[in-house]
Regions:
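His/Asp/Glu-enriched, well-ordered alpha-helical/loop segment
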Residues: 56-66, 70-151
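Conserved acidic residues
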Residues: 39-40, 89, 145, 164
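Active-site-proximal flexible loops/turns
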Residues: 29, 101, 152, 157
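Short glycine-/small-residue-rich flexible loop motifs, especially phosphate/cofactor-binding loops
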Residues: 9, 30, 50, 104-105, ...
């Protein structure tokens, strides 16, 4: 896989594409990724790797399902643990596309992050990290991709986020 890895490292440099490492476990993994130009560590498997990534100015990406499930399905570090340590920057949907809103809600409900902090993990921070400067915030001149959310109170006392409306580039699509 080394020739393929080098191809993607070179391609991302040539074309100005943000590069992420994957499943960093050790300091050496993070240092190699940083040397290759990675600006993100996707799914660091240990607190050690996540800390090292931050020391190199890299953003840590974790999966929404990890937050919702309460931990990694493969026994790696929990996203909530990284959030508590100030090491969680971006949430990705990973293998459950609908997990982002639930993950944001979990982080807030557990008192790990404020609403603005949790929402930034799925909006402005990933947009900036990937060079998508036309989105990620509610500001004049940006795309205006928005969702309207209702927080439903369930009979068991839990709360659940329900999407009520969606706007894409300022036009309501749902």
């Amino acid at each position: 896989s080394e020739p393929h890895r080098q191809y993607f490292v070179d391609y991302s440099r040539t074309h100005g594409i943000a590069l992420a490492s994957h499943d960093d476990t050790t300091v050496a993994h993070v240092q190699q990724a940083h040397a290759e130009g990675a600006s993100m560590s996707e799914f660091p498997t240990t607190v050690l790797a996540a800390r090292e990534a931050h020391q190199h100015g890299m953003r840590n990406v974790m999966g929404g399902p990890n937050v919702v499930r309460g931990g990694s399905h493969s026994g790696n570090v929990a996203a909530v643990e990284l959030a508590r340590l100030g090491l969680l920057d971006i949430l990705s949907s990973d293998y459950v596309p609908g997990s982002l809103l639930s993950a944001v809600m979990c982080l807030v409900e557990q008192g790990v992050m404020t609403w603005p902090q949790a929402v930034a993990t799925v909006t402005s921070t990933p947009a900036l990290a990937t060079g998508l400067t036309d989105r990620g915030a509610i500001e004049a001149g940006l795309r205006a991709d928005l969702i309207q959310v209702h927080i439903a109170e369930l009979p068991n006392g839990h709360r659940h986020a329900v999407v009520r409306a969606v706007w894409r580039e300022g036009r309501r699509v749902l």
